[in-house]
């Protein structure tokens, strides 16, 4: 498949940087009580990022070895190698490198599905990932699909990690 040049707009970049908002980066387990509005803001920001990720999706095979879509051989919307690399670099420039950047780097050079890309890029924002997981389950069920993960979350690595 020919790779198209996909440009990301300044507005879309600002959405990614918005993930650093105070209410988004609160650490789970603090004494601070989160409001319903906090959760809605987190979910809204995550869904905006998911839309941006979808804009990059053109390939047809996921090479993320922890992904059940790959294991089942399902076809969906995927990022090409260069698209994921470009998105990861843009994300890191805006938000800083995540704590697990070495694990992230292992995925660059692979085709990554939307769900894995979202998981990888948001993995250092645990509250967002948790809320996004719940919303993605709802989306899968609304579409008549069974959530890919029967144990744990859609974002869980299940101890597999990438084959390098």
Swiss-Prot record:
Origin superkingdom: Viruses
Q: What is the name of this protein?
A: Protein 4
What lineage is this protein's organism placed in? Viruses, Riboviria, Orthornavirae, Negarnaviricota, Haploviricotina
């Amino acid at each position: 498949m020919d790779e198209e040049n996909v440009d990301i707009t300044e507005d879309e970049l600002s959405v990614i940087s918005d993930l650093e908002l105070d209410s988004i980066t609160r650490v789970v387990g603090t004494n601070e009580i989160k409001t319903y509005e906090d959760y809605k803001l987190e979910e809204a920001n995550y869904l905006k990022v998911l839309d941006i990720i979808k804009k990059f999706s053109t390939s047809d095979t996921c090479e993320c070895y922890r992904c059940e879509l790959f294991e089942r051989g399902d076809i969906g919307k995927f990022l090409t190698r260069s698209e994921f690399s470009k998105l990861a670099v843009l994300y890191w420039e805006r938000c800083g490198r995540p704590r697990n950047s070495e694990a992230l780097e292992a995925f660059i050079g692979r085709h990554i599905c939307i769900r894995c890309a979202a998981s990888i890029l948001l993995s250092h924002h645990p509250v967002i990932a948790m809320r996004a997981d719940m919303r993605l389950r709802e989306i899968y069920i609304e579409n008549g699909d069974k959530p890919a993960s029967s144990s744990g979350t859609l974002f869980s690595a299940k101890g597999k990690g990438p084959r390098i």
